[in-house]
């Protein structure tokens, strides 16, 4: 049997895929940079070897799975070609793997990681289910019929997939380094929808998704009355959110989720609709929704002294609004402080005004330097351009995080898709050593 060697095994998707293959009984190893990433923990727990990059890592009889960040000129990929070892890109391999199961792709501009994790958790309550989540978590369940996986629209990678079912959470303009505009994004999702084999569950509150064409039935969910699955009587508390679900205007069941913000009602509704379609009973769905622990880097909370620290992946204005709304729901009456690190110069430039508007939902705003992508040039843009648009906002550096101590009893929300976590870690150290 072949050995699967992952070039860039610490990537979130790559790490999750390696875990799935390992669990299914395959021999797996990988290589990456030596810097520690949170995705390593699950690999180390399984005893999956993680090696430094070297052309000597590749041997005849191996199959190389290459991360999308690595060019064909990478030493290990070149070594594989010289040895006639097959090299397959991450998204293509994932497409082939998914075809062996009843596959459910979860996609959309926002909310796909949480929705993938929630769907996998709920379905496991009824059937053995394998899954791959974009937070670096994967599980291969031997004998499983279902495979739930996150499908990313970036560079149209999700066009490598031909799933049985798809959940589409929303369509929004993002990844401006690749997509030209919202119409370009829509065309990618439209093409993906045409590849779904059995059925689509889509958010009917989204104006773009209302215009999606497909060869299979589309079930719409949302808060609007015209949806097939509608959430009504939403009650938000500091413990979570309760709501009733109506299927084509007929009461189906009541649900409670230990999550916050309207976006999480929609994520749960997508999962409820898919599970209903697959014949999972309301009692099982309700019980599993209540025990969902969340996914990594999505509203991950920690109490430090009298403050609550939240780590969140939000890196788009719409995501920032949703995260701050959730913080206000769970901690009403407490000061909410946003600490934001913009991710990529192209995104920061494109959404400069929108970032300023969304961040002003917080009581105080601290800005960290822009986290640039290896693929881009920053030109003249700097974090000060964003600071000028947000009254009373301050710049934050790793060395001066102690300034956050003045916000006693506050909720500190660290947001970004780069290395914002290092600012939180630095702050935690500053508090502990005080």
UniProtKB/Swiss-Prot annotation:
It comes from Geobacillus thermodenitrificans (strain NG80-2). GO terms for molecular function: ATP binding; UDP-N-acetylmuramate-L-alanine ligase activity. Cell wall formation. Its EC number is 6.3.2.8. NCBIfam families: murC. Keywords: ATP-binding, Cell cycle, Cell division, Cell shape, Cell wall biogenesis/degradation, Cytoplasm, Ligase, Nucleotide-binding, Peptidoglycan synthesis. It is an enzyme of class 6 (ligase). PANTHER family: UDP-N-ACETYLMURAMATE--L-ALANINE LIGASE, UDP-N-ACETYLMURAMATE--L-ALANINE LIGASE-RELATED. GO terms for cellular component: cytoplasm. It catalyses: UDP-N-acetyl-alpha-D-muramate + L-alanine + ATP = UDP-N-acetyl-alpha-D-muramoyl-L-alanine + ADP + phosphate + H(+). Pfam families: Mur_ligase, Mur_ligase_C, Mur_ligase_M. Belongs to the MurCDEF family. This is UDP-N-acetylmuramate--L-alanine ligase. It is found in: Cytoplasm. ATP binds at residues 108-114. Its main location: cytoplasm. It comes from the Bacteria. GO terms for biological process: cell division; cell wall organization; peptidoglycan biosynthetic process; regulation of cell shape.
